[in-house]
């Protein structure tokens, strides 16, 4: 497992903007307004409703569908619905979101981990960026072990840091320094989050490999290798990544 401090330095270096390349014809390009993972430009919170779970192997589990952009206040809305259930009720949350608020995505993931809530990505629009971070917090109430389930036809996507520049603004050395500090704050938050949910840094390379303006979809093989359960839509069987890992390690 990679050391968090090493990854932090690497991520800050990768995400650091090349300001020299932004100077052209005596005109300074304005610098970033935000430093974050891909955000969905949409107002309003996600819609949270009760849903049936189409995946076998989850008996006596109450399902919730989380659909829409990740926005501030979503965690509280979800907790409002879950609080109506007996505390010993097993819960799974099906995530369908193109992304959104990074901080809220991390907060959701931490809650899933603390409350031992299973996370699911079904076929459909999938779960990307801030949503995929929340997905990683899924855990089984029965075993206490990670329990993140992705449909073999369900898109799960990660996104690299994006730095947005305003061509109508001039930037100063302080602006540049603030931007670099912002990058480091985001990477620190990600590393702290992975540590909180007891996850190694396996998923960080998927973020780094993604083009800045694109989502990198995780193939099923990489999903299993990363410790995520995959529900095979063809065989209707749930693949336990720990068993595959043991078999591969034994050989």
What do the PLM-derived regions correspond to, one by one?
Residues 102-109, 113:
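Membrane-embedded segments
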Residues 162-250:
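Charged, glycine-interspersed solvent-exposed loop segments at helix/strand-loop junctions
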Residues 113, 117-163:
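Glycine-rich beta-to-alpha active-site loop
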Residues 1-22:
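N-terminal secretory signal peptides that target proteins for export/translocation
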Residues 93, 135, 223:
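Terminal peptide-recognition signature
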């Amino acid at each position: 497992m990679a050391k968090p401090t090493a990854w932090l330095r690497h991520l800050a270096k990768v995400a650091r903007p090349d300001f020299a390349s932004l100077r052209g014809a005596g005109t300074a390009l304005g610098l970033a307004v935000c430093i974050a993972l891909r955000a969905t430009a949409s107002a309003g919170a996600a819609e949270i409703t009760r849903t049936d779970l189409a995946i076998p192997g989850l008996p006596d589990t109450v399902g919730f569908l989380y659909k829409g952009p990740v926005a501030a206040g979503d965690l509280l809305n979800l907790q409002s619905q879950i609080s109506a259930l007996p505390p010993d009720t097993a819960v799974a949350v099906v995530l369908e979101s193109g992304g959104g608020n990074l901080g809220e995505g991390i907060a959701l993931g931490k809650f899933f981990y603390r409350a031992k809530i299973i996370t699911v990505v079904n076929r459909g629009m999938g779960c990307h960026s801030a949503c995929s971070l929340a997905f990683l917090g899924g855990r089984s109430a029965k075993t206490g072990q990670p329990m993140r389930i992705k449909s073999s036809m369900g898109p799960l996507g990660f996104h690299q840091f994006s730095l947005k520049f305003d061509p109508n603004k001039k930037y100063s050395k302080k602006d540049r320094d603030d931007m670099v500090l912002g990058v480091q704050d985001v990477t620190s938050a990600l590393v702290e989050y992975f540590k909180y949910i007891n996850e190694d840094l396996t998923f960080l390379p998927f973020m780094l490999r993604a083009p800045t303006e694109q989502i990198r979809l995780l193939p099923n093989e990489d999903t299993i290798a990363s410790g995520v359960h995959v529900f095979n839509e063809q065989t209707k069987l749930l693949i336990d990544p720990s068993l595959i890992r043991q078999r591969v390690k034994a050989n």
